[in-house]
Amino acid sequence: MSDLSAQKRLAADVLDVGENRVWFDPDAQSEIADAITREDIRELVADGTIDAEDTQGNSRGRARERDAKESYGHKKGAGSRKGKAGARQNEKREYVAGIRAQRQQLRELRDDGTLSPAQYREMYNMANGGEFDSVRRLTNYVEENYGDS
């Protein structure tokens, strides 16, 4: 096997890649050894005898494994947390999601006749004031106070 370092250097320049990314066809060593000009190298590139290998990317295998574990609640303990609680879960978004769900539930109860418009307005204002932590608490309150009517 002959020394092809000069050809590798020329090929790297022609292909505009680093020398480590230059690939030579193992079956065409003698043909490559005869190529001594840039034009010769360009012809071999056109033939497919010399090519540039793809760049090495970062493997996402470990990231996928970690994401899978986090999706079912692992790796989320106190030692893994860096931001404050409000940075990890936005308090405003949490509030907005909760109040929208409660208001939707109140609308449904009003529309199906469980609540009168006056009761609906009273409950709406209570929800707005933070009286209910969740839709479940709101539903329990309705059942306890307005369930008979």
UniProtKB/Swiss-Prot annotation:
Single GO MF annotation: structural constituent of ribosome
Basic and acidic residues biased stretches: 62-73
Region called Disordered, residue ranges: 45-94
Source taxon at top rank: Archaea
UniProt-listed GO biological process terms: translation
InterPro entries: 60S_ribosomal_eL19_sf, Ribosomal_eL19, Ribosomal_eL19_arc, Ribosomal_eL19_CS, Ribosomal_eL19_dom, Ribosomal_eL19_dom1, Ribosomal_eL19_dom2, Ribosomal_eL19_dom3
Biased composition (Basic residues): 74-85
Cited SMART domains: Ribosomal_L19e (SM01416)
PROSITE patterns: RIBOSOMAL_L19E
Cellular component aspect of the GO annotation: cytosolic large ribosomal subunit
Pfam family of the protein (one): Ribosomal_L19e_C
Keywords associated with the record: Ribonucleoprotein, Ribosomal protein, RNA-binding, rRNA-binding
Physiological role: Binds to the 23S rRNA.
Family under the similarity heading: Belongs to the eukaryotic ribosomal protein eL19 family.
Subunit structure: Part of the 50S ribosomal subunit.
Protein name in the entry: Large ribosomal subunit protein eL19
Species annotation: Halobacterium salinarum (strain ATCC 700922 / JCM 11081 / NRC-1)
